[in-house]
């Protein structure tokens, strides 16, 4: 098993590139199943274990998948008759595998998908997915760890109001409705940039989707969708992680590919703390010096502060003066990294859904383990400024969402290595 070893204290400087977005490429790959004519080519695809997993899922469904890692490109040909079942072997590894259900229902009228896996942060229920499919005319039942869906009369447009703006449910319902007969209106939808990217992709394939990025999405179903070439948007969570790497080390970094409009809530908090940010068409420059101001953070659905940046922001707040409170409203079990920060001498207490940070912590190197994907990055960030040596284990989480993070940080001046232990 690998571990990352960091000797803290180096100020990071230089330029770094952002990969394609993990949270965009996974739904776009599954949406490629919608194309019954021609093949799709996706570019700017990050080399992640989750991409490998979803490619394997698509292959089991009888799609032909070619992954060129050297060119960060994936070709998907889904023109053959698709298999209806996404097996537990792959789906159990990653929650996003549930996203094949919408395309399978749209193409075949029936699907069997194992209940999903992924990071252990909260229950993340699938009720909203099921609600949407049922509204579109599918019969759903759960049996022996599988979700069985059947729309014997085909999917039909519907008016759907989500109880919560679930990202996955929004994506799944969009894909199912894109080939349904008639018009669908989905209210209280997720508004993340990744939703917009998915809608843009389906529209490029011949779909008719409007309103992505707003509270209400309207879909006019079409009879057929076609394979196209599509570039995945930059990863705003990786970009945010790298901005914090610059801020936490009081460094000077240009993050090429960072898009201001995709991370407005994070940028607002960084500026409130006294971090200097400069915006260019090609990316964002981050510089920081001296003491940072205390701020409170509350995670919310987009455009609120992203839960996927909560643990990285916690690492930064450990280096700021004063009293700080982080409130997690999206997932109920996303403070598992607090115990690991405490091993590094962090002064944090947790009360329910809030974590309280008192003063500036004198972080010390320790052996810590990643508890989920973003916590892995956060512990590495803390290690960049901790006194002494930090060792981060359980890197399987990190590899699900970051490409060569240690290498990028090393190129900026960090004393960091990935070693086989």
From Swiss-Prot:
<dbReference type="GO" id="GO:0071555">
    <property type="term" value="P:cell wall organization"/>
</dbReference>
<dbReference type="InterPro" id="IPR036968">
    <property type="entry name" value="Enolpyruvate_Tfrase_sf"/>
</dbReference>
<keyword id="KW-0573">Peptidoglycan synthesis</keyword>
<dbReference type="GO" id="GO:0008360">
    <property type="term" value="P:regulation of cell shape"/>
</dbReference>
<comment type="similarity">
    <text>Belongs to the EPSP synthase family. MurA subfamily.</text>
</comment>
<dbReference type="InterPro" id="IPR050068">
    <property type="entry name" value="MurA_subfamily"/>
</dbReference>
<feature type="binding site">
    <location>
        <begin position="22"/>
        <end position="23"/>
    </location>
    <ligand>
        <name>phosphoenolpyruvate</name>
    </ligand>
</feature>
<dbReference type="InterPro" id="IPR005750">
    <property type="entry name" value="UDP_GlcNAc_COvinyl_MurA"/>
</dbReference>
<feature type="active site" description="Proton donor">
    <location>
        <position position="119"/>
    </location>
</feature>
<keyword id="KW-0670">Pyruvate</keyword>
<dbReference type="InterPro" id="IPR001986">
    <property type="entry name" value="Enolpyruvate_Tfrase_dom"/>
</dbReference>
<dbReference type="InterPro" id="IPR013792">
    <property type="entry name" value="RNA3'P_cycl/enolpyr_Trfase_a/b"/>
</dbReference>
<dbReference type="GO" id="GO:0019277">
    <property type="term" value="P:UDP-N-acetylgalactosamine biosynthetic process"/>
</dbReference>
<keyword id="KW-0132">Cell division</keyword>
<feature type="binding site">
    <location>
        <begin position="124"/>
        <end position="128"/>
    </location>
    <ligand>
        <name>UDP-N-acetyl-alpha-D-glucosamine</name>
    </ligand>
</feature>
<comment type="function">
    <text>Cell wall formation. Adds enolpyruvyl to UDP-N-acetylglucosamine.</text>
</comment>
<feature type="modified residue" description="2-(S-cysteinyl)pyruvic acid O-phosphothioketal">
    <location>
        <position position="119"/>
    </location>
</feature>
<keyword id="KW-0808">Transferase</keyword>
<keyword id="KW-0131">Cell cycle</keyword>
<keyword id="KW-0963">Cytoplasm</keyword>
<dbReference type="GO" id="GO:0008760">
    <property type="term" value="F:UDP-N-acetylglucosamine 1-carboxyvinyltransferase activity"/>
</dbReference>
<dbReference type="GO" id="GO:0005737">
    <property type="term" value="C:cytoplasm"/>
</dbReference>
<feature type="binding site">
    <location>
        <position position="308"/>
    </location>
    <ligand>
        <name>UDP-N-acetyl-alpha-D-glucosamine</name>
    </ligand>
</feature>
<feature type="binding site">
    <location>
        <position position="95"/>
    </location>
    <ligand>
        <name>UDP-N-acetyl-alpha-D-glucosamine</name>
    </ligand>
</feature>
<comment type="pathway">
    <text>Cell wall biogenesis; peptidoglycan biosynthesis.</text>
</comment>
<keyword id="KW-0133">Cell shape</keyword>
<dbReference type="Pfam" id="PF00275">
    <property type="entry name" value="EPSP_synthase"/>
</dbReference>
<dbReference type="GO" id="GO:0051301">
    <property type="term" value="P:cell division"/>
</dbReference>
<keyword id="KW-0961">Cell wall biogenesis/degradation</keyword>
<dbReference type="GO" id="GO:0009252">
    <property type="term" value="P:peptidoglycan biosynthetic process"/>
</dbReference>
<feature type="binding site">
    <location>
        <position position="330"/>
    </location>
    <ligand>
        <name>UDP-N-acetyl-alpha-D-glucosamine</name>
    </ligand>
</feature>
<protein>
    <recommendedName>
        <fullName>UDP-N-acetylglucosamine 1-carboxyvinyltransferase 1</fullName>
        <ecNumber>2.5.1.7</ecNumber>
    </recommendedName>
</protein>
């Amino acid at each position: 098993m690998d571990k990352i070893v960091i000797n803290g204290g180096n100020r990071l400087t230089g330029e770094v590139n952002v990969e394609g977005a993990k949270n965009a490429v996974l739904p776009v790959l599954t949406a490629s199943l919608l194309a019954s004519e021609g093949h799709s080519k996706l570019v700017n695809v990050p080399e992640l274990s989750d991409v490998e997993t979803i490619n394997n899922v698509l292959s089991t469904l009888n799609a032909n998948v070619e992954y060129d890692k050297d060119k960060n490109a994936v070709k998907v040909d889904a023109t053959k008759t698709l298999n209806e079942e996404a097996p537990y072997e792959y789906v159990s590894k990653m929650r996003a595998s549930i996203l094949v259900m919408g395309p399978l229902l749209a193409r075949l009228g029936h699907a069997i998908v194992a209940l999903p896996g992924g990071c252990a942060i909260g229950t993340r229920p699938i009720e909203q997915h099921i609600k949407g499919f049922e509204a579109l005319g599918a019969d759903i039942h759960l049996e022996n760890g599988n979700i069985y869906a059947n729309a014997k009369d085909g999917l039909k447009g519907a008016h759907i109001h989500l109880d919560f703006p679930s990202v996955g449910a929004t994506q799944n319902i969009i894909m199912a409705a894109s080939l349904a007969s008639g018009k669908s209106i989905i209210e209280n939808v997720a508004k993340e940039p990744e939703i917009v990217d998915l809608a843009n992709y389906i529209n490029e394939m011949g779909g008719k989707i409007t309103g992505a990025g707003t509270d209400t999405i309207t879909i006019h179903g079409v009879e057929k969708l076609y394979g196209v070439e599509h570039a995945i948007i930059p990863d705003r969570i990786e970009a945010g992680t790298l901005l914090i790497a610059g801020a936490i080390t009081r460094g000077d970094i240009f993050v090429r590919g960072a898009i201001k409009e995709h991370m407005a809530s994070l940028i607002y908090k960084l500026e409130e703390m006294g971090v200097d940010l400069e915006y260019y068409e090609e990316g964002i420059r981050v510089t920081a010096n001296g003491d940072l101001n205390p701020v409170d953070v509350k995670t919310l659905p987009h455009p609120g502060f992203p839960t996927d940046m909560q643990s990285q922001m916690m690492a930064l707040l450990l280096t700021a003066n004063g009293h700080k409170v982080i409130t997690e409203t999206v997932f109920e079990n996303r403070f598992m990294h607090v115990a690991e920060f405490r091993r590094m001498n962090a002064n944090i207490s947790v009360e329910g859904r809030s974590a309280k940070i008192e003063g500036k912590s004198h972080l010390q190197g320790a052996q810590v383990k990643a508890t989920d994907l973003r916590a892995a990055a956060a512990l590495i960030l803390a290690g960049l400024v901790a006194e002494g040596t930090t060792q981060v284990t359980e890197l399987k989480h990190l590899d699900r969402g970051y490409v060569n993070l240690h290498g990028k940080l090393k190129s900026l001046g960090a004393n960091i290595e990935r070693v086989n232990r």
